[in-house]
From Swiss-Prot:
The lineage of its organism: Bacteria, Bacillati, Actinomycetota, Actinomycetes, Mycobacteriales. Residues 1-30 are annotated as: Disordered. Zn(2+) binds at C384, H435, H562. This is Threonine--tRNA ligase. InterPro entries: aa-tRNA-synt_IIb, aa-tRNA-synth_II, aa-tRNA-synth_II/BPL/LPL, Anticodon-bd, Anticodon-bd_dom_sf, TGS, Thr-tRNA-ligase_IIa, Thr/Ala-tRNA-synth_IIc_edit. It comes from Mycobacterium leprae (strain TN). One of its GO terms (cellular component) is cytoplasm. Residues 279-585 are annotated as: Catalytic. Pfam families: HGTP_anticodon, tRNA-synt_2b, tRNA_SAD. It catalyses: tRNA(Thr) + L-threonine + ATP = L-threonyl-tRNA(Thr) + AMP + diphosphate + H(+). Binds 1 zinc ion per subunit.
Length: 702
């Protein structure tokens, strides 16, 4: 691998800068809260930190799993589990409380601002506001300053229960978005205002006299006071539709982040800076790989020559490995009649993700009357229904199973403009899509070998830090019987558990037709990405009446396994670009070698070396520009070219070249044949490290 794929320090929830304090009970050990006493008193009695420490307790979890404020007073003796700030739940609480502080600051500085929602999100929080003008960077600085004043004041978070919805409506009559939420029953996880057993507000109180300063409709929980926010930062602002619906008002969203310590915040901000440096959208332009022209539309990429080389290498290696593993390649069209997606269920369960239909094939008489009615065609959002038609195109025998079909199939999904994100969330993309048809008896072995194949192939591209996620049935959105789902889920769970990889449950996360295993990978920054999906489906074979002849001559239904290894070519391209910061392994790099002459007199010699490399299949160029050698080196270093070969008078005279690498190391005076051999071996061996003088082994050299 070219870079470590371990999480950044502290990403596991611990703070390596804070030494362990002896004598304190583990925050994970339950404690007793006596009836009539506060949770805070019980936490203090247990000797646990409640303020100032990176593992300070901010809330507790009751026996039902519900998070409770430290001010909570139970009616009976209860056992609770303290939740420290340096855990996912703890961070979520301080981030939500910080969002309240942000909203208070906005209404202090912009009194006409109307409040939207302000949930915690991964690594941060946001709050939506209806304001006359977009927020500027100067506004964010002023808001952050006001927030620090609020934090310093130590305002108390106080929970208040409404006696009725009517009481809440009266209080929030001047806040139209909050008023809408009073009656919300959507269950949307991002709506923190409602959804609990009671309709509540949280007031910010003056710590000295208890007077209400500000408040928000909210189900909680929250930290005790604003002083319990250790470290925060506002990061950016953007436009956002109210509740993500383009038909609603456009609001202004402010994003921020909050952490358990200044050190943890600093680490996170450093990671953000590094992530911005690695952003595939930025690198795609800088390295001339791909672009998103406005003339084509949002979420639709075009790959330039260099990007197409990387993509071709990705595809060709995958194609070869699939052929070796017994897959058969197929091709299907981009559009299909509507009936296919009625049969599959996509138009019933996935209509919001499909582009509008094209009405075609209608024929009219001269007088305008319809001679032949037309029909709707759809851009395909998935390849699976078409692959079932390949299976059913003729009779099948058990001897043909498992039948492994594979396609680089371009599909189209209607993603809202607000969620489109470069190559990783596009509207048109190519899935490396496989559908395997097997018997029930073959299912377990096929799943086990498939998971191993997926992990091995991803490892060949330099990704190695994996865990699995098991997505199970959404009770509100599924087809088929409970028994079929249980059988499919059990098969996937057994294979996942036998893999020895960490397994994370994802209840309700499956598609409507079957449960799935998702292979998650951590990149060089420790960020998690969903890669491959493996989905067991008993339902499509039933819906499409798929059959094979078994050994005893009876007709049986096959089991169908859906599998996308990269997820999509485009998404995998974007992830690899960020993982390697644009410095692709030499075997993937669009330009593998560039020759840099000291002067124009050395061009012809380097062109001979380039011809020798090209004859071995190495993508080689010679820089014949009029720029000075130093400028050429900088340019090709910035373009992430793995190998630079320099040549001057001495090299021409001795038949040698000098290696120059991206880390500024160099190997001088290497015989050209030895140089060619070293480069070819490095590429053929598919080394994923970026070459350096230390790593590249050559005969001779200085």
């Amino acid at each position: 691998m070219s870079a470590p794929v371990h999480p950044v320090p502290g990403a596991d929830g611990g703070d390596p800068l804070r030494p362990a304090t002896p004598g304190l009970r583990s925050p994970q050990v339950p404690i007793q809260v006596p009836a009539g006493s506060t949770a805070a008193a019980a936490v203090s009695e247990a000797g646990l930190p409640t303020h100032g420490a990176p593992d300070a307790i901010v809330v507790v979890r009751d026996a039902d799993g519900k998070l409770r404020d430290l001010s909570w007073v139970p009616d009976v003796d209860v056992e609770v589990t303290p939740v420290p700030v340096n855990t996912d739940d703890g961070r979520s609480v301080i981030r939500h409380s910080t969002a309240h502080v942000l909203a208070q600051a906005v209404q202090d500085l912009f009194p006409q601002a109307k409040l939207g929602i302000g949930p915690p999100i991964t690594d941060g929080f946001y709050y939506d506001f209806d304001v006359a003008e977009p927020f500027t960077p100067e506004d964010l600085k002023a808001l952050e300053k006001r927030m620090r004043q609020i934090v310093k004041e130590g305002q108390l978070f106080s929970r208040r229960i409404y006696e009725s919805k009517e009481q809440a409506r009266t209080e929030w009559a001047g806040e139209p978005y909050k008023l809408e939420l009073v009656d919300d029953e959507s269950g949307d996880a991002e709506i923190m205002e409602v959804g609990g057993d009671e309709l509540t507000a949280y007031d910010n109180l003056n710590a000295r006299n208890g007077e209400r300063i500000w408040g928000d409709l909210c189900r909680g929980p929250h930290i005790p006071t604003t002083k319990h926010i250790p470290a925060f930062k506002l990061t950016r602002s953007s436009a956002a539709y109210w509740r993500g619906n383009q038909k609603n008002a456009s609001l202004q969203r402010i994003y921020g982040t909050a952490w358990e310590s200044q050190e943890a915040l600093d680490r996170h901000l450093e990671m953000i800076t590094e992530a911005q440096r690695r952003d595939h959208r930025k690198l795609g332009i800088e390295l001339d790989l791909f672009s998103f022209p406005d003339e084509i539309g949002s979420g639709l990429a075009i790959f330039h020559p260099k990007g197409s080389i990387v993509r071709r290498e990705m595809e060709e290696y995958s194609r070869r490995k699939h052929i070796e593993a017994g897959y058969q390649f197929v091709n299907t069209p981009h559009i299909t009649k509507a009936q296919l997606f009625h049969t599959s269920g996509h138009l019933d369960w996935y209509a919001e993700g499909i582009f509008p239909p094209m009405h075609l094939d209608a024929e009219h008489n001269d007088d305008g009357t319809v001679r032949k009615p037309g029909q709707d065609y759809y851009l395909k959002p998935m390849n699976c229904p078409m692959h079932t038609l390949i299976f059913s195109s003729r009779g099948r025998s058990y001897r043909e199973l498992p039948l492994r079909l594979f396609e680089f199939g371009t599909i189209y999904r209607y993603e809202k403009s607000g969620v489109v994100h470069g190559l990783t969330r596009a509207r048109g993309f190519t899935m490396d899509d496989s559908h395997i048809f097997c018997t029930r008896e073959q299912l377990h072995c096929e799943l086990a070998s498939l998971l191993r194949f997926v992990l091995d192939l991803l490892g060949d591209y330099g990704l190695e830090d994996f865990y699995l996620e098991l997505s199970t049935k959404d009770p509100e959105k599924f087809v088929g019987s409970e028994e079929i789902w249980e059988e499919a889920t059990a098969a996937l769970a057994e294979v996942a558990e036998n893999s020895t990889l960490p397994l994370v449950p994802d209840p309700g996360g499956a598609a409507f037709y079957g449960p799935k295993i998702s292979v998650q990978v951590r990149d060089a920054l420790g960020r998690s990405w969903q890669m491959s999906t493996i989905q067991v489906d008993f339902n499509f074979p039933e819906r499409f009446a798929l059959e094979y002849t078994s050994a005893d001559g009876t007709r049986q239904r096959p089991v169908m396994i859906h599998r996308a290894l990269f997820g999509s070519i485009e998404r995998f391209f974007g992830i690899l670009t960020e993982h390697y910061a644009g410095a692709f392994p030499a075997w993937l790099a669009p330009i593998q070698v560039v020759g840099i002459p000291v002067t124009g007199e050395h061009v012809s010699y380097l062109e001979e070396v380039a011809a020798q490399l090209k004859s071995c299949g190495v993508r080689t160029e010679v820089d014949v520009s009029d720029d000075r050698m130093a400028k050429k080196i900088v340019r090709h270093t910035n373009q992430k070219v793995p190998f630079m070969l320099l040549a001057g008078d001495r090299d021409v005279r001795t038949g040698s070249v000098s290696f120059r690498f991206g880390d500024r190391t160099q190997i001088n005076g290497v015989a050209r044949d030895s140089a060619v051999e070293a480069i070819v071996c490095w590429i053929v061996d598919r080394e994923n490290d970026f070459p350096t003088a230390e790593l590249v082994k050559v005969t001779g050299g200085e």
